[in-house]
Amino acid sequence: MARFIILFLLLAPVYSRLCLRNHPDTTWIGDSRSDQSRVNQQSLDLVTNFKGILQAKNGNGLMKQMSGRFPSDWYQPTTKYRILYIGTNDCTEGPNDVIIPTSMTLDNVARDLYLGACRGDVRVTPTFVGAAELGLIGRTDALTEFSVKVLTFNNPTIVVVGLNGMSGIYKVCIAASSGNVGGVNLVNGCGYFSAPLRFDNFKGQIYVSDTFEVRGTKNKCVILRSSSNAPLCTHIKRNIELDEYVDTPNTGGVYPSDGFDSLHGSASIRTFLTEALTCPGVDWDRIDAASCEYDSCPKLVKEFDQTGLGNTDTQIMRELEAQKEMIGKLGRNITDVNNRVDAIPPQLSNIFISMGVAGFGIALFLAGWKACVWIAAFMYKSRGRNPPANLSVA
């Protein structure tokens, strides 16, 4: 039996396959080249027979849109399962954008925005901004319902952005001649914040974006990333908390630089996605947003990184080595079990022998005791005496 199992494992097909959820309750969110929320006909052809909802709502990328304006209805799908495509337009922010004191890191911004948009319910709301010129005690101008505009302050001003208890992320950019945050002098640039921010002695211009708020992370989602290296989307790729993702292949050319609407121009990606959306035999009632199948055994996409695996031959060799290692462990386990089974008869024999010796000894003791009783009773009778009751012979 063990040999049959090993032979079966050796002959079993070794392959890997990515399956994206192709189901009416799945929303595909793409990366378009502009703020226009659209998926053109070529893109529809790309995902042939896609049964879900096609929605290109992250126009220039989530982080990039914080420098413009989110569409008022940005990303409000009602489906439970989602596929979020991250293209090159999502990766254009650079480290020079994060220089305002107390700003979040790009890694943390990417994690909260993309992981939140993938799994959570998103709401875009205006960011509160309040301002009070120094010397005007008791006066505060609350600039409510204000977002994605630039204000100019010609006199030293206290500027407060955000409210206590707020949730979400907003972007601020400044061009100031004076001002500080917590005593640290300002440097012109931008930053991302998830808590209220106060500028003291501020003179110059300030830009504040909408607040991007994520509520809950209850949805199942896979993040599909471009494998293009121009530009590098390092602040997304190196974040380990974006754990359900897969890179598009770069065989036959890299992902086009102008975004989701040009995906139809890359044959390798068109083939990749078409096959990923038409995986046969996948029970989507049991498998979540995406799966990777090794020998018909579903695994999460986070265990599968096409770019990291290298070419197909290398992957097959790795899979074969893994199978051989598993077979070796199986063989060692079978040998160990056989050794234990072979060891059982001697152990049982020793037990039976010990029990036999003990039983024979007890029998001899009882026989000797009975003999002594008979001899004592006989001696009493030979002398004409009646033996004691405890020496009576039955």
Swiss-Prot record:
Transmembrane region(s): 348-368
Cytoplasmic domain ranges by topology: 369-394
Region Highly polymorphic region, annotated ranges: 335-358
UniProt keyword NAD, yes or no: no
Catalytic activity: N-acetyl-9-O-acetylneuraminate + H2O = N-acetylneuraminate + acetate + H(+); N-acetyl-4-O-acetylneuraminate + H2O = N-acetylneuraminate + acetate + H(+)
MF-aspect GO terms: sialate 4-O-acetylesterase activity; sialate 9-O-acetylesterase activity
Subcellular location: Host membrane; Virion membrane
Extracellular side: 17-347
Any one biological process term the GO annotation gives: fusion of virus membrane with host endosome membrane
GO CC annotations, alphabetized: host cell membrane; membrane; virion membrane
EC number(s) reported in the record: 3.1.1.53
Pfam families documented for this protein: ISAV_HA
Glycosylation-annotated residues: N333
Membrane topology annotation: Single-pass type I membrane protein
Cell membrane as UniProt keyword: no
Active site: S32, D261, H264
Motif (Cell attachment site): 119-121
Keywords noted in UniProt: Fusion of virus membrane with host endosomal membrane, Fusion of virus membrane with host membrane, Glycoprotein, Host membrane, Host-virus interaction, Hydrolase, Membrane, Signal, Transmembrane, Transmembrane helix, Viral attachment to host cell, Viral penetration into host cytoplasm, Virion, Virus entry into host cell
Primary localization class, coarse: host cell
Signal sequence, start to end: 1-16
InterPro entries found in the cross-reference section: Hemagglutn-estrase_ISAV-type
Protein task: Performs attachment to host receptor thereby inducing virus particle entry into target cell. Binds specifically to 5-N-acetyl-4-O-acetyl neuraminic acid on host cells, which plays a major role in cell tropism of the virus. ALso mediates de-O-acetylation of N-acetyl-4-O-acetylneuraminic acid. This receptor-destroying activity is important for virus release as it probably helps preventing self-aggregation and ensures the efficient spread of the progeny virus from cell to cell. The highly polymorphic region (HPR) modulates the virulence in host.
Protein name: Hemagglutinin-esterase
Lineage: Viruses, Riboviria, Orthornavirae, Negarnaviricota, Polyploviricotina
